[in-house]
Amino acid sequence: MRVSNQGSAETVWLVLDDAWEFNEPLSFEVPKRVEALESGPSLRYITSQRMIERFCAEFGEIFRPFILFGSGDFHHLTALFIRQMKEPFVILSFDNHPDWVVGPVHWSCGGWVNRALENPLVQQVAVWGCGNFECGFPWRLRGNRSACRSGRLWVAPWRSEKNDYPDWLHPISTADWRTAFIRFIESIRTSAIYVTVDLDCLAESDAVTNWENGRFLLADLDWAINFLRKKARIIGGDLSGAFSPTRYASWFQSVAGRLDHPRQRSVTDRKRRSINLRALEVVWPILTQA
């Protein structure tokens, strides 16, 4: 493990892949860099409890309240990062996918919400901005419907003419989502919120990711996180979702990953990094501000 000396004491950049490069002046302070490239392939997309605990034993001491990491293929690490929290809190996720799949693979980017709900301090997980097919029928049958029905998991997908959503989902539209968001935040019983941002919640114009893009614009995230800061305490958070070339440690990860991932759109490396860096320069400062 190699650690740089730069960055705020409250932030860290966990380098698991090649999603980010900071070779030019930026409008924010780059977090302390922690090299974890050797661990990346074994953790990517799906992994085991053994690998999770090994990773936590090696890197847990460098976790900070706010963590920048790479592809959304690593989003399940959020369920690990929140172990730092010491008080009851709500997780608010901006994501184009519900990440709620109940299945035999215990640790995966598509099911991390269930691991987070196992944490006794997590009062609720709310996922805003799901636009892919997983909330539609029959794919939603793979989701954690019991948690949705109990209210412990709140999923707000974008409305679609193709989908007739059940009453345990909370559909939104571009015209009304801010009103719904305000109402939801004002209903939360605790003031402590952990915010996790997957850049795939953004439209194609605002992010290049390994997954399908959503409908939010950067201005939407700017508004939402600033609103949160007025109404609640952001006690921690993370940001992932930037595209990176896939590297897996096992054939099973490779086969499953290739079957599950969408076809990547053609974008030059230079344009990809430029688009994602612009997103980071907007979201990271407002997420991590004191």
What is each stretch, according to the model?
Residues 2-69, 73-90, 121-122, 126, ...:
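Catalytic cores of soluble, metal-dependent hydrolases
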Residues 74-75, 106-113:
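Short acidic (Asp/Glu) patches
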Residues 102-107, 208-210:
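Short, solvent-exposed loop/turn segments at secondary-structure boundaries
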Residues 91-103, 112:
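Long, hydrophobic, well-ordered secondary-structure blocks that form the structural core
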Residues 95, 129-131:
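Conserved acidic E/D residue at the C-terminus of a beta-strand in Rossmann-like folds
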